[in-house]
Amino acid sequence: MPIKKEREYRALAAPLTAQSATKLIQTEYYVEGYATTFDAPYLLYEFEDGTKIYERIDAHALDGADMSDVIMQYDHEGRVFARQSNKTLILQLDYKGLKVAADLGKTDLARGLYQDIEAGMINKMSWAFSVAEERYDRETHTRTILKIKKVYDVSAVSIP
């Protein structure tokens, strides 16, 4: 994954699936999942001495964030599999987090990614973003992201 200096990347253990009772996009190559969830602290890092650093995304962190023409990639690398501008990617904020719905039927490579997701070979998500405002609680070792400046991409990932 090419790391960009101004961006942060987070993977989420929430599932990315090819099954859904209610589709946001009508296509046979439909996938959905969550790029992030709100108000649920997760382990960000553990030091050798056992000190654990946690992070949580505030429920209002994405309010007003730049989410113009976000793309969907695999492992945050180069190839675009879906994007907002051609309506093959929908990002939806709900009570749980940032929901992602995508149509992976427009290209052979996108259909290949769909097949990997459907087979359970790829089943997690990640996202790339920049932070505008944050807070750190030294007592609980928890970083709270209060405001996201921009969302760059959401990605299906092999290893979260």
Where are these regions (language model features)?
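Signature of dsDNA virion morphogenesis modules
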Residues: 1-160
